[in-house]
Curated annotation (Swiss-Prot):
GO terms for cellular component: HslUV protease complex. GO terms for biological process: cell division; proteolysis involved in protein catabolic process. It comes from Tolumonas auensis (strain DSM 9187 / NBRC 110442 / TA 4). This is ATP-dependent Clp protease ATP-binding subunit ClpX. GO terms for molecular function: ATP binding; ATP hydrolysis activity; ATP-dependent protein folding chaperone; protein dimerization activity; unfolded protein binding; zinc ion binding. Keywords: ATP-binding, Chaperone, Metal-binding, Nucleotide-binding, Zinc. The lineage of its organism: Bacteria, Pseudomonadati, Pseudomonadota, Gammaproteobacteria, Aeromonadales. Gene3D superfamilies: 1.10.8.60, ClpX chaperone, C4-type zinc finger domain, P-loop containing nucleotide triphosphate hydrolases. Residues 4-57 form the ClpX-type ZB domain. Component of the ClpX-ClpP complex. Forms a hexameric ring that, in the presence of ATP, binds to fourteen ClpP subunits assembled into a disk-like structure with a central cavity, resembling the structure of eukaryotic proteasomes.
Length: 426
């Protein structure tokens, strides 16, 4: 196929018929009847064909009917327990965002502004789940980023532009589809400024990241390398308009309640005539978060320009024990339903008794992990049973009660064969 002789006979040197590169400049040269093509041109042709197929056959109208805020809220109710105010705020913000993308500008030339979202709520309150559920409902690309891994360009860590690269990967580098996507940036509170005062040292993972995110969130043309990097000199960077992408930032904001309390505490002034600030009333975390103002976020460590790019603020409440029990059983993809489906594949029914559900919720409350800690508790309790079940025959039912959750006993196995059940009990 190629001539590897090094006898100085240049007439035998083979070249790609498309890009003109010699056999020594490419990894592979494929021969046809008096024609040759290199591996780089093959890759380029594949990319062109994929794009044409997507444009002709794969193109379908996206979101032919934009769900109303009521429908968005109803869909969120199916998967997320509680957080009614946050759901309403999100439903309106998301509806307005995609309405803006469809309308462009109104007849009188008024350009609609972009409304990105800031979610404030304790760990395990449902911030990530809300964002994921919205993306599924709207059938748009969705990606998550961890703000703690981001640094300014030129420093060790992840550049903010990598967020757009991840979004493109989720939709097979379809720029149009990516520009309708949703990006969720978690742990946004971790990039707060280290202090209120400007520092002489560069804060590359705090204020520096906030500065880097400003343009991306507000709207800019981000240049992203094509799929697999720049394999071919003719390949250009993909241009992505981030003004059409909805950014949702979320964080637990530990300590923000103290900042709010300092601002809202009764009384002010100094001296004999000053009112004493009252601390008699115990204010919950949820009540404090409900009173958050932009000035509190500035004092916490977010720069004013960054807060300005996140005009829609939704606060999530702490989940109590009853809410955690609801999360275990009520959503369409509830945790107990998932494990019951898993056991059903082994031909066994899984039953969680009421006292078991309360014990799981109580344990999660003690760990202060919210809904996020529920899976690890259930997984730990059912580990031995899931290990043994595939090797045991005639098991028709597995029962989990409070004693199992507390580690006092193993889950009860009920067999089709009563004699075997009696033997296991002995």
């Amino acid at each position: 196929m190629t001539d590897k002789r090094k006898d100085g006979d240049h007439s035998k040197l083979l070249y790609c018929s498309f890009c003109g590169k010699s056999q020594h400049e490419v990894r592979k040269l494929i021969a046809g009847p008096s024609v040759y093509i290199c591996d780089e041109c093959v890759d380029l042709c594949n990319d062109i064909i994929r794009e044409e197929i997507r444009d002709i056959g794969g193109a379908r109208p996206h979101m032919t009917e934009l769900p109303t805020p009521h429908k968005i809220r109803a869909h969120l109710d199916d998967y997320v327990i509680g957080q009614d105010l946050a759901k309403k705020v999100l439903a309106v913000a998301v509806y307005n965002h995609y309405k803006r993308l469809r309308s462009g500008s109104s007849a009188d030339g008024v350009e609609l502004g972009k409304s990105n979202i800031l979610l404030i709520g304790p760990t395990g309150s449902g911030k990530t789940l809300l964002a994921e559920t919205l993306a599924r409902l709207l059938d748009v690309p969705f990606t998550m980023a961890d703000a703690t891994t981001l640094t300014e360009a030129g420093y060790v860590g992840e550049d903010v532009e990598n967020i757009i690269q991840k979004l493109l990967q989720k939709c097979d580098y379809d720029v149009e589809k990516a520009q309708r996507g949703i990006v969720y940036i978690d742990e946004i509170d971790k990039i707060s400024r280290k202090s209120d005062n400007p520092s002489i040292t560069r804060d590359v993972s705090g204020e520096g990241v906030q500065q880097a995110l400003l343009k991306l969130i507000e709207g800019t043309i981000a240049a992203v390398p094509p799929q697999g990097g720049r394999k071919h000199p003719q390949q250009e960077f993909l241009q992505v308009d981030t003004s059409k992408i909805l950014f949702i930032c979320g964080g637990a904001f530990a300590g923000l309640d103290k900042v709010v309390e300092q601002r809202t505490a009764q009384g002010a002034g100094i001296g004999f005539n000053a009112e004493v600030k009252s601390k008699d009333k115990k204010v919950t975390l949820s009540e404090s978060f409900a009173k958050v103002e932009p000035e509190d976020l500035v004092k916490y460590g977010l720069i004013p320009e960054f807060i300005g790019r996140l005009p829609v603020v939704a606060t999530l409440t702490e989940l109590d024990e009853n809410a955690l029990i609801q999360i275990l059983v009520e959503p369409k993809n509830a945790l107990t339903k998932q494990y019951q489906a898993l056991f059903k594949l082994e031909g066994a029914e899984l039953e969680f008794r009421e006292d078991a559900l309360r014990a799981i919720a109580h344990k999660a409350m003690e760990r202060k992990t919210g809904a996020r800690g529920l899976r690890s508790i259930v997984e730990g309790v059912l580990l031995d049973t899931m290990y043994d079940l595939p090797s045991v025959e005639n098991v028709s039912k597995v029962v989990v009660d409070e004693h199992v959750i507390n580690g006092e006993t193993q889950p009860i196995m009920i067999y089709d064969n009563p004699e075997k059940q009696a033997a296991s009990a002995d």
